[in-house]
Amino acid sequence: MDLDFHIKPEIRVLGIDDSALLNEKVMIVGTVFRGGDWMDGVLRSEITRDGLDATEVISTMIKNSRHYAQLRIVMLDGVTYGGFNVVDIEELYRETGLPVIVVMRAYPDFEKIRAALRHFSDGELRWEIIKKAGKIEKLVTEKNGTPIYIQKAGIGLKSAEKIVRLTSIRSNIPEPLRVAHLIATGIIFGESRGRA
């Protein structure tokens, strides 16, 4: 059931992004923000490149964090991490009790994704997890009108849109995701690069 609820300006949001695919283990970084203005902490873990452990690793990282009790929302930069290690957002919501908002800069090319998944013996399972993430909604967060796309679990569309807009203060990407990306790439490459 997706709920809409009152959103405080300093709602605690955890944004998660992954690093570059350089090894079999891929670093994931989470940043804890109060709204879009204030970073309270950084979380780190590792997932398997092209594995199936992203949901479990992210859930464990969240539940073992000292920030867990204050967190109200988890934001993901897409549903695939470390190549095609797919996050089951419904399961992540059930495991953590925290609503999940997936943010994407571009609408996914499902044809290309399906083609890539044909190279995996369990490609059909991964495809089902991707489909299970639900309807993709278009959202404009900034004045220039550049849209982003979101999916959600455990939260109503109005609340999800409000939280994304509240936390998108520097660009059309929410600060928790933008900063997680900067940290993840900076640690791996010695300097941040690319866009969240």
Curated annotation (Swiss-Prot):
Spell out the family assignment given in the record's similarity comment: Belongs to the UPF0215 family.
What protein is this chain from?
UPF0215 protein MA_4269
Question: Source organism's superkingdom?
Answer: Archaea
Q: Which organism is it from?
A: Methanosarcina acetivorans (strain ATCC 35395 / DSM 2834 / JCM 12185 / C2A)
- The disulfides recorded in the entry are none
Give the lineage.
Archaea, Methanobacteriati, Methanobacteriota, Stenosarchaea group, Methanomicrobia
One Pfam match, by short name? DUF99
